[in-house]
């Protein structure tokens, strides 16, 4: 029996977003006061992300008889991430040159007030590649979970899962216990997801109330260019990859519409991470691949952030009248490939990453970030949506490469079969 439309989660979230926009626009002070609702929902989700990743990765790896497979899956995932991320960076660069969103501003960098971006610049300075790699190693096992650092949690999970796999039958009871605990945490996710409309309402009301729709007008060309480019990237680049793997990107997007609306409302792709992992398992991807690819992708496969970074850099250069040579643009690409790995699925991280990129490329004034500070929140939604779609496609692709994709289930679910996560426990965890 079909649910009444008003009980469907994505309908509730969409309605909440619309109400949030209206409240923020007509009663901005009240809209700003709704911020705790959005923040509270994201904190509830972040509270559960660590245990979800740990349980999923550990049970997935513990079920592998060949430990070389873990390295193989990780290697394929990183190769995919680098290739697609490079495409995203190039597309952002090309779109900015083609559509020229910054031409005509004629702004003198010396007249820009950098106080507003000081906090982002201070956060952006500091981390070298070595420091980034060292940061992945937590001070203690428990500090990884206390800090909520996804890469640190992933490292702990990899070691724990590998140890259980080596112990084999002697550790079987531990694996079974973690599997049962995993079910408990996923049930908690279902409960938290029920309040997603409230979180989306609060976050959207705050965004519109604080920044106002009027702040969009002067920079509509940049916003339109970014959204248009992201849509083209998803439909053409990710669509081609999906077609080569044997599924439709449009149907895939329809399948994860609830997660996308949650991301749209909160501007954070992390808000949908636990539910997304469930959906991908339900779609036919093996638990081991989901557990490895999705958390890693939140630092290494941020397609939307990559498009945004190169486009924003060229926009600032155009707006301030700076001509970039081919070598300077190649330098920007190289730097962006490194700095983008420091981004995460948290709201505002893309802006911090942009500051890090500009700090390494002295040709373009960091002060130019002031131009897009007011609209960054409105671009954050598109970044997060593109990121989560990209990570979903990556997981299906790597599962297919590993021959651990249940293609019959994939076709059935995307063609309108049961896509609910309630019966996820029935999905096998082994080779598909």
Swiss-Prot record:
State the compartments where it is located.
Cell inner membrane
Q: How does it sit in the membrane?
A: Multi-pass membrane protein
Q: Which GO terms describe its molecular function?
A: fumarate transmembrane transporter activity; malate:proton symporter activity; succinate transmembrane transporter activity
Gene Ontology terms: cellular component: plasma membrane
InterPro entries, alphabetized: C4_dicarb_transport (IPR023954), Na-dicarboxylate_symporter (IPR001991), Na-dicarboxylate_symporter_CS (IPR018107), Na:dicarbo_symporter_sf (IPR036458)
Listed as disulfide-bonded, the cysteine pairs are: none
Q: Does the keyword Zinc apply?
A: no
Free-text function comment from the UniProt entry: Responsible for the transport of dicarboxylates such as succinate, fumarate, and malate from the periplasm across the membrane.
Q: Which PANTHER family match?
A: AEROBIC C4-DICARBOXYLATE TRANSPORT PROTEIN (PTHR42865:SF1), PROTON/GLUTAMATE-ASPARTATE SYMPORTER (PTHR42865)
Record's family? Belongs to the dicarboxylate/amino acid:cation symporter (DAACS) (TC 2.A.23) family.
Q: What is this protein called?
A: C4-dicarboxylate transport protein
What organism, scientifically named, is this protein from? Cupriavidus necator (strain ATCC 17699 / DSM 428 / KCTC 22496 / NCIMB 10442 / H16 / Stanier 337) (Ralstonia eutropha)
